[in-house]
Amino acid sequence: MIVIGDIHAEYTQYLKLLSRYPGQSSVQIGDFGIGFRQVPELPEGAWFFRGNHDNPELAREHPHYLGDYGVRELDGVKFFWVSGAWSIDQQYRTEGVSWWRDEELSYAELEQAVDLYEKERPDLVLTHDGPNVATDFILNRYSLHKTKPIPTRTGQALDAMWSIHHPKKWIFGHWHVNWKQEIEGTEFRCLGELGWCEVNKEKK
């Protein structure tokens, strides 16, 4: 299974990447760009969930949308995912055109997602943003912001998940850097724009 970072409606490059892996499933982990440009026909097995730069309504209507959160198995790889994030640049965007008020899941939806996470205790987690234990490393290493971004309900939910259970792998995007580090037994990986990685079924 291929996991792909933010593409921001760069569909030509996205489809070119998918063509290198015919027959393999893929999951694009948010900031797909739906709502900014017409989405081309996607190959079978190409899935995505939304980030903070996606139109939530259009995403939910698309046949290749995984859903807002849940558990799925593709190519023998089982994973848990959560959509959405908070936009630090929303003051520069236009509501309903380039920014959507429901970019994050609601508190109730996130609470349900945390409950499902606790029940499933997954080995692999895919999210658009990452928990603070990982994003703090990125902020410090790359000096992305002079001040730490404000706490968000998505971030708080991801932190709650991390406190409940440490998965083997956690892959996210949002921060536009390629970064990987093991923290307390979890291999965290941030995918940059059009970054990707392959996740294989674990051998028993």
Where are the predicted features?
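Short catalytic/ligand-binding loop motif for oxyanion handling, primarily in non-cytosolic enzymes
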Residues: 10-12, 35-37, 56-58, 72-75, ...
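Glycine-rich, phosphate-binding/catalytic loops in enzymes
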Residues: 20-21, 42-44, 141-145, 187-189
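Binuclear metal-dependent phosphoesterase catalytic core
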Residues: 72-76, 159-164, 176-204
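Active-site-proximal loop/helix segment associated with metal-binding centers of metalloenzymes
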Residues: 75-153
